[in-house]
From Swiss-Prot:
Annotated EC: 3.5.1.89
Lineage: Eukaryota, Fungi, Dikarya, Ascomycota, Pezizomycotina
Job of this protein: Involved in the second step of GPI biosynthesis. De-N-acetylation of N-acetylglucosaminyl-phosphatidylinositol.
Protein name: N-acetylglucosaminyl-phosphatidylinositol de-N-acetylase
One Gene Ontology MF term: N-acetylglucosaminylphosphatidylinositol deacetylase activity
Length: 335
């Protein structure tokens, strides 16, 4: 009797998991997908610190926002070429694995990781390799687990890339302008508390403050969304974190003002709005993206097949049960 019950449980579990996962997904084919805000007809930049950040942390976001029917143009800006590697050595005396950090191009991975990022980006829906920009400036942006990047350097780079006329605007009364509408990056905890990740958050906020300096009467042309960091336990429960993130989003939407409710409806394109005299609804306070099984496999393949140099043993666990391979919830930052 017990063996029959165990067999039945093992047989039902995969089916139950598939049904649960399908219902939790937020894509257009999901039964619940249309109930969550998204972005349409936007110029979007994902700001990351290292090649593979886009696959290990932001795959659900990229796979969702690059859907052709949404009309978004997504780019990736990576501030290092990933020339830091971790070397794990078994210490025969203690029996423990010791981790050494190799910096510079001692690991010979710099040019390889640039190519891997481009391949991964295409698997995650970007239109072209030219939409991936990689900064190779170790003096300002060293790939290091201990170095904090200057927020002025990050902000200055963003300004030169997306608001080159910023200096001229500072002395005029015209509305601030930028060549992107949406900036995505890590939050202040950086998911893993990596100092490079956390530096992007502070640099991105400094960039928006620079855009608005002396322009308080105008709306900011760039909306900043940051990826929510979670507890250690939630990081490794995969799709089972979806209900938690959904509940958090619903509560936030209920008390977050009208912006989220307005953004629930599909808005017409900017050009159509201008012709009709329609004011574009404000961006949602929170965004939630939950991969379908197919999209999870796409993100999994982006990491496994594109970032081959990074597939050491402990990353297999992350891409298999890690919640960031399935669930992304992003919060709009008020600057």
């Amino acid at each position: 009797m017990n063996s029959a019950f165990t067999f039945l449980s093992l047989a039902i579990f995969p089916l139950a998991l598939f049904i649960f996962w399908t219902l939790s997904a937020t894509g257009p084919s999901s039964p619940l997908g249309r109930g969550f805000p998204t972005l349409t007809n936007k110029r979007i930049c994902l700001l990351i610190a290292h090649p593979d950040d886009e696959a290990m942390f932001f795959a659900p976001t990229l796979l969702a926002l690059t859907k052709p029917e949404l009309g978004n143009h997504v780019k990736i800006l990576c501030l290092s070429s990933g020339m830091c590697a971790l070397l794990m050595v078994l210490d025969s005396a203690s029996g423990w694995f010791l981790i050494y950090q190799i910096t510079g191009d001692a690991a010979g991975l710099g040019h390889i990781r640039k190519q891997e990022l481009q391949k991964s980006a295409l698997r995650l829906g970007l239109r072209n390799e030219s939409d991936v920009f990689i900064v190779d400036d170790p003096s300002r942006f060293p790939d290091s687990m201990t170095a904090t990047w200057s927020e002025e350097n990050v902000s200055g780079l963003l300004a030169s890339a997306f608001a080159p006329q910023l200096a001229a605007q500072a002395s005029s009364q015209s509305a601030p302008m930028a060549t992107i509408d949406i900036l995505l990056t890590f939050d202040q905890s950086g998911v893993s508390y990596h100092p490079n990740h956390r530096s992007l958050y502070h640099g991105a906020r400094a960039f928006l403050k620079a855009l608005m300096r002396g322009n308080s009467g105008h709306p900011c042309p760039v909306t900043l969304y940051t990826l929510t960091s979670t507890t250690l336990a939630r990081k490794y429960i995969g799709v089972f974190d979806a209900p938690i993130a959904m509940l958090s989003g619903v509560i936030s939407n209920a008390f977050g003002g009208s912006g989220d409710r307005d953004a629930l409806s599909t808005s017409p394109s900017k050009k159509t709005q201008e012709l009709r005299g329609i004011r574009e609804p404000p961006p949602a306070n929170r965004l939630l993206f939950v991969n379908s099984v197919d999209d999870w496999l796409s993100g999994w393949k982006a990491m496994v097949y594109a970032h081959k140099s990074q597939m050491v043993w402990f990353r297999w666990g992350w891409i298999t049960v890690g919640r960031y391979m399935v669930v992304n919830d992003l919060k709009k930052e008020l600057v």
